Structures are given as C-alpha cells and as structure tokens.
Amino acid sequence: VICIGNITVGGTGKTPMAEMVIAYMSQMHRVALLSRGYGRRTKGYLEVKADSRYRDVGDEPLQIKLKFPDTVVAVCEKRADGIRRICAEHPDVDLIVMDDGFQHRYVEPKVNIVMIDATRPVQHDRMLPLGTLRDLPEELHRAHYFVVTKCPEKMAPIDRRILRKVLIQVAYQRVYFTRFES
C-alpha cells in the first residue's frame, strides 16, 4: 500500500499525486485506488465503474476511474475493510494506492507520501477548529516522502532549508518541492 495524505484540510494536490503514482506504477503493477469518496451519499464498500454516479462514489474517485479505466477504483470509509475487499475480489492487484489515508492508523502502508502546502506551513498552523491541522505535526515521523506543493517559481534556498528542518524527523525521510505550471 502506498498512502498519499496530508495533515491539513484543503487542497494540497493529493489527487494529482495519486494520478501520477497510478500512471507510473501501472507500468509495473496491477494497481487499485482506494478512497473514502468524500461527498458521496452512500456508505460502505463500493467499486467505482465508468457509469457510476458521483453522488454514489464521490467526484474524485469517479474522475480517476474515467482517466484510468483499467484500474480498480473503490471507495470505503473504513480503509482496512476496503483493502481486504480489494484483495479478496481482485487477487491480481499487487499495489493499492490509498488516497487521503494518513490519519488511518489501522493501515500501515509500505510508503507514506505526505503532501504539504507551501503557502500554509505546518509550523505556523493550529489544530482544528482554530487552524487547518487535522493531525499533529509530530505524526509526520511516519512519512517517508514529503511533497511540498504550490511552491513559488523562485523559492529561496533558505526557505527550502527551513521547511526541510521542520518536516524531517527521521533520517530516511525525503522532501521534494513542486509547483503548478499553467
């Protein structure tokens, strides 16, 4: 399992990262995506089909299914249950990408990719409802990779160093800086 998550509310680029991981890893693996399916009106485990309604499965899982029709896409609010169902119903799947699952402690991914918004540094943020943090910054020790998104085109080296110092808690962690191009 590769988990793509964050510790804040709001868009940090998890879905575009999930799409990039699926596109790359599908060359070597039979990949599935597991999402909670935010905004859906249903509960429990559902597989996303090309003709699924976004109200039933969520807009982002449907978007991914339409973009990657050969990828198994499922939604389940209980991620451990969702992983078990995917494995049972699709024994050929050998890699599951878990979208927005960093807070789910019942699952221990092989790789945790944590997305960080450069415009909202975690060291200056507070827990909900006073801020945008939905997990403690101390939990970042579980991350393997940090992808800092929305970086300015010319990010100062000192700003990169400060972010690395804030984020890296154990020696194996790596930080990557990205920006959107229009």
List each model region and its residues.
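Hydrophobic anchor at the start of a short beta-strand
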Residues: 30-32, 112, 175
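Beta-strand-loop-alpha "switch" segments that mediate conformational coupling across diverse proteins
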Residues: 175-182
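A structural preference for short, hydrophobic beta-strand core positions in alpha/beta folds
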Residues: 33, 73-75, 177
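Walker A (P-loop) phosphate-binding motif
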Residues: 1-50, 152-153
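Active-site donor-binding loop signature of nucleotide-sugar glycosyltransferases
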Residues: 6, 118, 180
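Phosphate/Mg2+-binding loops and adjacent switch elements
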Residues: 37-171
